[in-house]
Structures are given as structure tokens and as C-alpha cells.
Amino acid sequence: MNKILNYIVVFFLFALVSCDYKPILNYKNYQFSLNVDKISGDEKINSIIINKFNNLKGNEKQYFINLSSKKEKNIISKDSKGDPVIFELIINVDYNVKKNGEKIIENNINRKTTYNNISDKFELENYENTVINNLSTNISDRIIFSISELNEW
């Protein structure tokens, strides 16, 4: 019985190591460049998104993008004193992509999350910055993915 268990464990370890898992968005070699034409809205969100686009420079197929971002922070719930307990953060990005002067994609992406208030305001601000960074990175990945789907045709 012990020998069979050892063989099963070795088999599963071998199977796990030989899978060669790679995240799709991190290792894919995109065959296009993405250049920013116009940006407006929240500077922090735009800079995070544009930094992801900078990895796509130098390819022969070139697309041009216009971005407009907006951040909204709402109070969802208050305690009996009127202090906020739960916040909602909404990031909205409108974008359009052009190739050879022709608009080929026009889209809107919304991402939102809720989180609890933190009594330490410095810690709350750091947490909000982390949330903004994560949501903006997710939005930039969605934009890149939508263009890569178009590029495969």
C-alpha cells in the first residue's frame, strides 16, 4: 500500500512540474504597437494604463488610442454617527482605437469595488492607491486583449 502511495505522489509531482503553465497576458508576444494619441481624465489611472502600453512599442502594426478616464468614490454605508463605513470606488475608461486614421474600436470599460473604511487615514490612502493600481492594470489588460483579438484576424 505504501509503495502505491509513493508512486501516486511521484506521478502527481511529475505531472505538475511538466505542465509549463504560463499566464496569457504576461508572456504573449503581441505583434502590434500601441501609441497614445490623446488622454484626458484622471492622471494616475492614465499613467498606469500608458505604462502597460509602453511594453508594446516597436512592432510593425501600429494602432493609436484615445483614452478618457474617470474615478468616482462613493460612500455606500455610514454608521450611527454619520461616519463612512463602506466605500465604493468606480473607474470608468472610454477609449477608441484607430488604425490608418480609421476608428476600429470604440469601447467603455467600468470596474468597481467596495471596501471598508480604515481608521488610519494614511493606511486607507495606501489601500485606495493599491485598489486603483489593480483596477487600472485590469483595464489596460482588457484593452490590450481586445486589440490582440482584432489583430489576429
Language-model segments: residues:
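Sec-dependent signal peptide recognition
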Residues: K3-V10
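C-terminal motif of bacterial Sec signal peptides marking the signal peptidase cleavage site
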Residues: A15-S18
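Bacterial signal peptide processing site
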Residues: D20-K22
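Post-signal peptide N-terminal segment of mature Sec-exported envelope proteins
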Residues: K28-I48
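Surface-exposed short loop/turn segments
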Residues: I50-N51, L56-E106, T113-N133, T137, ...
